[in-house]
């Protein structure tokens, strides 16, 4: 709980708007999270998987019309269209507040309002930022507890500061027509309605860590980038850190968790992962470029992840992971997805919740955008500097893409 006046004022506004039956403050303790996991299983929001083969792992299915980020319903709401930038969708802030509040009004009736205090970046880092998300989804709470630093320590770090990001998520009716993911940079506010899919509702991820953070960075003199961060150690023990910018589904996670080829391994080269998706970049006091990973976990695409393509990622998913929209193997209560192995289960439930036989079905069992949410600490090659408050110094930046034609990815640097 907090005594921060700006937080309490906003929470009072949210309570009056959403009309919840109960309010629960997420303190991040294992006992509270375990109670929520049990409740999610009781309500059918999650399924507990085989404790021997996948300890602490769960399966969740979204609605079939709610399986990915909705770029066409994602808006930057700034006073002028020019401020939103040429690559974003723009809406008038006043009009959108009115529309969104009308959609969200009383949507928590009979439900619990979960209040999640979270830190993007290590708590106490001068480069970290704090957010507070209210949600009516246990799935969101449990994913945020993996993807960010959550709990009482965040309140202590925030103190009485008014510098924090407001996040409202409401599942509402999951209407596609009334689904909106809106950002109000001038107000430090994010509002997401009528979705329950991770990328739209885990408001610390793209919404905060890239979109709102880009505005904050422009204002404060730093960068929020869609980049992985990895460290490479040579045989002499010298470590160099590299950032790499690729669009989604271009292999950032695979590169971030790279195992050096045998030739280099034998020579003593090692690779360490600091992040697979987002980097916050600052100029340090020494004039070098420094980076932190604002996230605390991996929200990876499951299909195609296997022992050959990314053994470190596969190992990362073996414990304390939430799987979304993959196949449920009923024979041993585990999960499967296309590209995992050749042993597609015959007695299974697909991502839509339908009976599925992988040996004969022409339909894919897992959604192409099915996901795993895993703690960063699970990764076998996670860097010992992952929680470094000042981040790590960047020596090089790689740019990549999947454009068919040959074209320079960098024209000027």
Specify the residue positions occupied by each region the protein language model found.
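Conserved internal helical-beta-strand scaffold that buttresses enzyme catalytic cores
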Residues: 2-250, 260-413
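Hydrophobic positions on the alpha1 helix immediately C-terminal to the Walker A/P-loop
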Residues: 255
